[in-house]
């Protein structure tokens, strides 16, 4: 039990002694496990729920067992986190980044790696045959051969991430820009030829040509490209909503304001409604976990996902500067 029960030990010991148990139980007190930049107090959580700031006690920004499960944390990752923290009588706080480290380590070889476009812009391959679709083999997880492979449809019109194209790129930008050649992951080399904008100057289409001899992502003449980007077939893609979560507490300003109220992060939830995913996602079920290539780990939301309306919660981003203490 936790340290506040330490004062009750004499009474506890007296009861056990007087009952003359042949194998008397022992009471051991230890400090509570606190996490940085999260809300754990029931009084505060209740207020967040009542004010509609979170959508319930299982809101993925909270750290209740129900919330962690909904967000996509596995039992194994939580157990590993507790093991790393250890048991102590000294009051201390564990870095939330350690919990994120544990779920990354648990999922990196378990979760299928699939392509999802969170902020899509259309990519048109001008010299690709009109109306043609070909199926390309893609490994589900290079770290786990047991997960096998799948086939992904490729065609003339694709979606790529908007951030993977720039008209006037800075130095060391190796993705798509006019005149540059990149690799479409597990597909072909493509060379950007330009873009189309709407009346407001926003890019609505990127155009390119492909090298038919580079199928699989390698060129027979041995030429190299520095950029590799992911994609999905525009016609056969699955539409989904994706929720990106950050800590509910503003890390820089601390947990509490001067008046004792919580210092909430206004950007703790970002909802993306126009995401495009490869067609294999259509079979996803509640609590299924995936790695979105180049994005992070995601879990199908059990509460808001409906037939034909997929909702994903980001469990954790793909990379972090956190280093496990020795």
Predicted regions and their residues:
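Catalytic adenosine-cofactor/nucleotide-binding cores of aminoacyl-tRNA synthetases and other
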Residues: 1-326
